[in-house]
Design a protein with these regions (language model features):
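Small-molecule-sensing regulatory modules
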Residues: 1-55, 138-321
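Short, small/hydrophobic-residue-rich motifs at membrane-helix boundaries and re-entrant hairpins
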Residues: 20, 71-72, 82
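Short, structured active-site "lid" loops
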Residues: 49-77
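Short, Asp-centered acidic motifs that coordinate Mg2+ and/or phosphate
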Residues: 75-79, 165-166
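A conserved helix-loop-strand patch within extracytoplasmic ligand-binding domains
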Residues: 82-85, 91-142
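Short glycine-rich, flexible loops that bind phosphorylated cofactors or substrates
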Residues: 86-87, 176
Length: 321
């Protein structure tokens, strides 16, 4: 009898839902049963102390415990939100599949059905992301941005309870939980860049598990992989962590899948001299050179002062602790 595969997942409702989708796809592709193994990460436990991700620092807060379970062979493979995955490769592990991406957009969940443009001045909008906070301030400097933590239930609850006027969340998370109807506004990713890898899932297994690697490869979506490779190369070359005020979005061209366009932004986390400062850039090139395109765009942005903005953001976060 073929052994049931063990899939490591975080315990949150969203993580369990995402892992369930991957488990079903693996079963459909291989005929093998998949068991979800719940694992608590540091990112999960830190929520109990209400620490902001931007203040904790470091990388891999949501993935290290899953990777350790893989290396101990407690699980056979693991599913991560790709935007949480550090850009440095993990020794003895491989990114076996990146399934087709969900919608990359950020959305607003606001009281009374408000859109971003018609929120009153001084409205309190919650987010735990420096990237979202910076871009909100670029679009609506008259809003009050409130740092928050928690899962989707907790964040949306700040609005329904009246503590906040709105929160910014990822479309993908709301959609996978069947709650996208709660969104009151949808941000154009050309104007409000998502996090690198947002909306994509990462399926990771041990490098030496050849049979499982081959099976998981059936879930891989080439255009999505090319796009996130470019975005993650941008992030890696900027030497920015997943909590930095960096946005990146690559689109494989619909009429020519051999080409993609990558856009990036680095912004100051707080106003400087009365305004948010930012560096934007974009680049088009072959999909099979996605990593080079990401590195090249990052180099251009660094030449325009992106490093100073990220350093300032780190100092501002440190001063707030």
């Amino acid at each position: 009898m073929t052994r049931t595969l063990r899939l490591g997942t975080r315990r949150s409702p969203l993580a369990m839902t995402q892992s369930g989708l991957v488990a079903a796809a693996v079963t459909a592709a291989t005929g093998r049963a998949v068991e979800l193994v719940e694992i608590t990460t540091y990112g999960d436990t830190s929520q109990a102390t209400n620490e902001l991700i931007s203040q904790i620092g470091g990388t891999g807060l949501w993935v290290n415990s899953l990777r350790e379970a893989l290396l101990r062979e407690d699980v056979d493979f693991a599913v991560h939100s790709l935007k949480d995955l550090p850009t440095a490769e993990a020794e003895h592990l491989v990114l076996a599949a990146i399934p087709e991406r969900e919608d990359v957009r950020d959305v607003l969940v606001a009281r009374d059905g408000h859109k971003l443009a018609d929120l009153p001045a001084g409205a309190r909008i919650g987010t735990g992301s420096l990237r979202r906070a910076a871009q909100l301030r670029l679009l609506r400097p008259d809003l009050e941005i409130v740092p928050i933590r928690g899962n989707i239930d907790t964040r949306a609850g700040f609005v329904s309870s009246g503590k906040l006027d709105g929160v910014v969340l990822a479309y993908a998370g709301l959609s996978r939980l069947g709650r996208i109807s709660e969104a009151t506004d949808y941000f154009d990713p050309a104007e409000f860049l998502p996090a690198p890898g947002q909306g994509a899932l990462a399926v990771e297994c041990r490098e030496d598990d050849t049979a499982l690697r081959e099976a998981l490869a059936e879930l891989d979506h080439r255009p999505t992989r090319a796009a996130v490779v470019a975005e993650r190369a941008l992030l890696a070359t900027l030497e920015a962590g997943c909590s930095a005020p960096v946005g990146g979005y690559a689109q494989v061209h619909h009429d020519d899948e051999d080409e993609l366009t990558l856009a990036g932004v680095v912004a100051s986390a707080e106003p400087r001299d009365g305004a948010i400062q930012s560096v934007h850039g974009s680049l088009t090139g072959p999909t099979d050179e996605a990593a080079r395109l990401g590195a090249e765009l990052a180099a251009r942005m660094l030449a325009q002062g992106a490093a100073a903005l990220m350093t300032a953001a780190a100092v501002q976060v440190g001063d707030s602790q």
